[in-house]
Amino acid sequence: MAGQELLVLYGSETGNAEEVAERIGREGNRRHFRVRVLALDAISPEHLASCSDGVIVVSTAGQGEAPASMRTFWPSLLRKSLPTSLLSNLSFALFGLGDSAYPRFNVAAKRLRKRLLQLSASELLPIGLGDDQHASGFHSALDPWLSSLWHSLRLKHPLPPSLHDPPPVSEGCMPPLDPPKLRVSRCGRCSRAESRRSRRSERLRASFVLDRVNQACNGIIPSSQTDSSIQSGVHSVHSAPLFRNCRLTSPSHWQDVRHISLDISQLPRSSIKHSHHKESEAPYEPGDLAAIMPEQAEDDVNAFLLRTSLDADELVLLAPSDNATVMLNGEASRLQHEPIRVEDLVAGCLDINGASPKRYFFEVLSHFAQSDIEQERLQFFASAEGREDLQLYNSREMRTVSEILYDFSTATPHLEYLLQVCIMLSFFCIDDV
C-alpha cells in the first residue's frame, strides 16, 4: 500500500542512534512510506499502541543505562499498570548500537525488545546489534539489517504497479538531495555596533536557539520557547578563572587525563543552585556537575566562514522546515527568537575543528561538489562499499569538518545543510566538583 505510515523512533546519547533513525526516515520516504522520525521521549506507550509499524534505534549509555532521549519513555513503558495486550497492534524492528568492549553490550536495546514482547508487540525481523569494535563500526551490521528491514516491510505492504522502490544506494548511484530539516530566513546584516555585542553570550544564545529548533524538528516540544527563556539560560553561564590544569597521566600514556580547578568564589550566590549556603561554605554539594562551554579559535571560525562563503554579519532566523517532523499534536513550533549573526551561529554551534562528521555528511557534500573526481570520491565514502575507507579516512584519522571541506574544495554546502550535518558543539561535564 502506497503511503503506509512508518514511525521511526530513537533513543540516543551521543547522536549515533539519531543519525541512524534519520537515515531510516530518508530511505523510508524514498520508498513511499509516510515517515515520522521522533525521539522516544516525544511519545507515550499509549501513542505507540496506536501505531502498526515502528522502527526503533537505541544506543546504550554508560554501564547499561537508557540513553538521554529515552529516559522519560523507558520508565513509563515499565509501568505495571500497562495491560499486557497494549502493543498487540504493533509490529516493530529494533536496532541497537553498542560496544562489545563493555560487559553490557547493547543491553538497552535488549531490555527494550524484551519489554515490547511482554506487551504483545511482534517483531518484523530479528534484532540488529551494531558494534563499534568492528572495523567499519556499527555500519557493518546496520547495512545488511536495513536491507532485511525494507524487504520485510515491502512484503507486508506491497506497492501498486505504478510505483517502484529506488535502487540500493551504491557508488555512483546516490539518491537525490533530501530537503533540509531547518529553515533559515535571512533578515539583513547587523551594524558594526551590534557586532561588538558580547560574543560569548551571543554564541551561547545561538546554541540554545539551535538546540530548541532541533528538538522541535524531532517532535519534542521545548520546555520554554521564548527568547526571554533562552536569555535566562544564557545568563546562568559564568566565567571563572582557571588556576590549575595538571596532566595526571604520564606523557607516554595515550590518554591525556587532567585535573582542572576553577575559582568560583567570586560568582554571585544567586546564580548557583545551592544559594542557601553560608558565605563561608562552598556553594555546591557532593555529586554536583560543572558544565564547561567550549570556545573555538577566532582564526578557525574566520577560515571556515571564508571557505563556506558565509557572511559573518548576516542575520538569520531559524525554524523547523515544512519537511521536519511536526509535533504530535499537529502544531508547528512557535519558538521565537531574535535574529542571530551567522558568525555566532558557526562559532557557538558547529564543531568545525573537533569531532569527525557522520556518514551522511559525505552524501550531502557529494551533491555540492563541482568536480567529478571529488563527487565520485564522496559518493564512494557515502556508499556501503566505501564504509571501511570512510572509517579510516574520517574516524580513525580524526578528520574534522574544516579539514574535509579543504580536501574537497569544490563542495560548498548551504548553511541549512551545514547546520544539519555538522556535529554540534556541546557542553562537557566535570564530575566530582
Q: What residue spans do the PLM features occupy?
A:
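FNR-like FAD-binding dehydrogenase module
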Residues: 1-433
